[in-house]
């Protein structure tokens, strides 16, 4: 499979770097800070990223309406888990579609991932709604597949959880209107926020209780989970931008590379606005934003200015593997998890390699779809 990428932002000026053969090289980041590699620990981090899991169980083996037709089934998640667990058996591809990938590590064995980062929409309906507050079936389904464990039905490495609009936009039945999003936020916090009295399964270095944004480090690489998006205030969310500014000032002011994760991106679907002529949201609309607006993106970009952001990984759109550059950011979006999609990433002091991939079959095989590489000077 070679993967063919169609133009995503026809009305907006950006550097596409989207080659139909799936091979992309990079330009410098507008956010690069003055870099002194001796100032931070060595970097040799391999990790996976996946978004849009959309667990769909509502009771027993019953799925939410339309989930089976859309492919949001447990069988498809098991295929995805099998591919993730076998990724270290594969080499970084030397070619995709007969074209050299240009990866710095091409032909080398993929190392066991340090973790799997989730880019939102863990569940399809706010964790799996029930009228009486209780643990939702969809959240149970998610944790039974995407919490580190053994055997063929769970991923075999730590999972860094992230929330999207499907996790956070579902209102509960009065008087428990915030129950479901609180349940999802509690799940993230209990998995990642350490306290004096509690050690979570995947502890992180810096957790913001208000926004549920968090950060951690793999050697000299700084990573930040921004949930739906950095600065989100929808459905009562508290903006994490002040926390982000302080986190970057404390942990990345020395110019070390930074990776960001959130649900929304800069693709045409994420940037939809209301189109009054067509009475719908689309990429030609001039009205209010469907997902996140120009001012919200500008505020996030302002918080990142001056830092060495080497990549942002997102989800939200399900069908198209995307590697593109917008507003000075290198952006990466795999196909949705329930469709088998994920990204494999390797970052060292000297380079960053990314491949977008898709699970194939039930035995853990993988198709590599697109590749990206950039060297650090």
Residue ranges and their predicted role:
Residues 1-10, 20:
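N-terminal secretory signal peptides
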